[in-house]
Amino acid sequence: MAGAAAAVAAGAAAGAAAAAGSVSAPGRASAPPPPPPVYCVCRQPYDVNRFMIECDVCKDWFHGSCVGVEEHHAVDIDLYHCPDCAALHGSSLMKKRRNWHRHDYTEVDDGSKPVQAGTRAFVKELRSRVFPSADEIIVKMHGSQLTQRYLEKHGFDVPIMVPKLDDLGLRLPSPAFSVMDVERYVGGDKVIDVIDVARQADSKMTLHNYVKYFMNPDRPKVLNVISLEFSDTKMSELVEVPDIARKLSWVENYWPDDSVFPKPFVQKYCLMGVQDSYTDFHIDFGGTSVWYHVLWGEKIFYLIKPTNENLALYESWSSSVTQSEVFFGDKVDKCYKCVVKQGHTLFVPTGWIHAVLTSQDCMAFGGNFLHNLNIGMQLRCYEMEKRLKTPDLFKFPFFEAICWFVAKSLLETLKELKEDGFQPQSYLVQGVKALHTALKLWMKKELVSEHAFEIPDNVRPGHLIKELSKVIRAIEEENGKPVKSQGIPSVCPVSRPSNEASPPYHSRRKMRKLRDHNVRTPSNLDILELHTREVLKRLEMCPWEEDLLSSKLNGKFNKHLQPSSTVPEWRAKDNDLRLLLTNGRIIKDERQLFADRSLYTADSENEEDKKPTQNANMKTEQSSGREEAESQGSPKPLNRIFTSVRSELRSRPSEYSDGSDSEDSGPDCTALKINFATEDSESSGDEKKHEITSHFKEESDIVRNLLQKSQKPSRQEIPVKRECPTSTSTEEEAIQGMLSMAGLHYSSCLQRQIQSTDCSGEKNSLQDPSSCHGSNPEFRQLYRCNKPVEFGYHAKTEDQDLMTSSWNKQFDRTSRFNAQDLSRSQKHIKKESSSEINQKAQSRHCVDSNSSSIQNGKYTLNPSLVSCQISNGSLSPERPIGETSFSMPLHPTKRPASNPPPISNQATKGKRPKKGMATAKQRLGKILKLNRNGHARFFV
């Protein structure tokens, strides 16, 4: 003591002298900072990671490892004397035990205080109590039966017991594996957390000291090890977690390798407990599910179901100051007892409240995992932990960060399921909703500062939350509609065992990723340049590859006769809206994708994917028996096209009806109808196969009339500046144009067919294309509309002439719209006089302006006008989307823009161009950008 006092005095004097020197010489450089104070006999500075104890005599601090005092022993010391002081004042004084039922055993046992959990009296009483058997709720099964498919179908809501290791995928050391082997693989210097059961308090100890305690038959107290995670040790090689835990685990499936956050290691725990070790009721951190396997010994689980009432009671009990004095099993309706013997494996689901008693010395292995089956319960448990102010040591590491990773991945999963036409399972939808709610809560202004730390750098929180909202809303809207069954696919992107068939969804997803990887655009391109390159690429395509996807219909026409080899690569980049071509109508169906065996590419390697799904994806309508017979009687698509072309040129309409469109496509949809009056005509034997109701007329005048009428541009087709003069090859061009719209290109065959066609006749007659092309479903279906309001009339002679000429012009113009005719039209220019053009434009404007009226927000046609209204070769943005146009969707090289550029002819000479359409750059911008009026939103 004298030496210590002298040292203190000397230190004080030195400090005073240094202070005086600094005051007397202010101009000098400041002295270096004093060294940190040192403690203990080792004279080392303070280390927060090492246990230290204070001497009650000299008031100096000593490392427990330097003076031979364990942390769990320190609580039993009443007065501590360091080695120097012990020589003068004697050894340390220990506390005296006065009870066996309280955590503080120094309290006087007057019988007034209740028993606390973990004490010797508590364990003795617990062993003597009777509980309902867990056999009432537990599910026992073989390892091969416990699959992800089973849990997704039946849920993971009750504990599962697997008596044997067979087919479970769990690999463990032999039952002869001891605590000394653990020390050898993990290392004796590793500091571990140890539970002092009698006090229900945590302390730290080296693994070597714990093994020494465990092997000692005379144990002064009960110590339990429940949190030795060994994933980063050599012992990890001896243990493989069950297959089901690995397949379901969020960490295994969603945690990115390049994350700035350290990967949570919670899958491999070694539990070593001596007899009478007890862990009070708890929910595993983050609401994780847990698996336990008893290598040797025995454990008893007390299980409580996580009902809303029980969870509320648990939170109240956990926050109570008398928690240790109340056995939680007495507060609930039922507490089940489950004995896990050597070799048994127990799976405890999310949120189950459980306590564990070690009935005999035991070594067990276990692990925790988050998964998609109970996302809502996991989030509820996490929020409960925050309200209870649970220490970070007992929380799931980076729980919020992994929630962001999972939300981002599940958003992609739901979008792919929707794209593939599958309905996500209810547990996944409910989980995404709960996750979306939690993410929104964390991003509130008053709370974002608390949660910003765990937001990953590669996640845009606001955008992700908005996208989740859209997907959830879309799923809710689709819930009432019939959809394809998804089966039970895996929602985690993991590989299945070889003996378990992979569902169609996995094959599509895998092939999609491979395809996307091959065609990935360099990241240094901006959006405008990307779309500009795509458009320029399309402009160089062959004329017969019609750009059906880019039309203003904002829909997708799936060609029945187009082989998969002719589908351009960019067709996969379409929007989600589909217009399905059925047997008789164009029907908008937003529920499912159209699938056809001929349209499958590399994405459909699975045999299950190649099954036709038209019945599940489309609304079908019965056609007349005559049309079915005609369709069945045509063995080849080419013959059907030839016959439909001949029939198109040989009939005359006498009655016409049209209707306005509705957004919904119902079963009562009716079509545009044209009834035909019968007249005598000549027909060859080959034409009798497709004869409908009217007799045929001679077609030479029809062709000439079509060509003459086509030279006069309709008001709605002004973007075509110049036209080709009539030539001897125009017949071939007209029919070849119609075939190019159908996806076929048989030029030589067409020439032979045209030569064999009878061309003698005098009168013009026109048959409805939707009827005469019964064998060509795609061409016929373009003349149908959804839910029309039907009206009809008997046409007069002048009305018939107007209808025939108007439709002939549109039909001939559409049929001639291919790249070859466009190039010819640029070479052979035919100009009309300005007076004639002005007169025609004014007369057509008067007729068209009086032909339609808006009633109840829908378009209806005046009976005096027979031609359908079209705008620039596409649907007008101001009209309903589903309204039918008598113009096929055109290739980008031939389609006019939504706002056409000014026409540089005499009719428009002197007029200012439209705003935003004066230059080619502005017009290209109109093509690349979204339509601003809200209708037909899509990218080219």
Swiss-Prot record:
Required co-factors: Fe(2+)
GO CC term, one of those recorded: nucleoplasm
Binding locations of substrate: T279, K299
CDD domains linked to this entry: PHD_KDM7
Role according to the record: Histone demethylase required for brain development. Specifically demethylates dimethylated 'Lys-9', 'Lys-27' and 'Lys-36' (H3K9me2, H3K27me2, H3K36me2, respectively) of histone H3 and monomethylated histone H4 'Lys-20' residue (H4K20Me1), thereby playing a central role in histone code. Specifically binds trimethylated 'Lys-4' of histone H3 (H3K4me3), affecting histone demethylase specificity: in presence of H3K4me3, it has no demethylase activity toward H3K9me2, while it has high activity toward H3K27me2. Demethylates H3K9me2 in absence of H3K4me3.
Residue ranges of every copy of the JmjC domain listed in the record: 230-386
Enzyme class: oxidoreductase
Reactions listed under catalytic activity: N(6),N(6)-dimethyl-L-lysyl(9)-[histone H3] + 2 2-oxoglutarate + 2 O2 = L-lysyl(9)-[histone H3] + 2 formaldehyde + 2 succinate + 2 CO2; N(6),N(6)-dimethyl-L-lysyl(27)-[histone H3] + 2 2-oxoglutarate + 2 O2 = L-lysyl(27)-[histone H3] + 2 formaldehyde + 2 succinate + 2 CO2; N(6),N(6)-dimethyl-L-lysyl(36)-[histone H3] + 2-oxoglutarate + O2 = N(6)-methyl-L-lysyl(36)-[histone H3] + formaldehyde + succinate + CO2; N(6)-methyl-L-lysyl(20)-[histone H4] + 2-oxoglutarate + O2 = L-lysyl(20)-[histone H4] + formaldehyde + succinate + CO2
Main localisation: nucleus
Source organism of this protein record: Mus musculus
EC number: 1.14.11.65
Protein name, entry field: Lysine-specific demethylase 7A
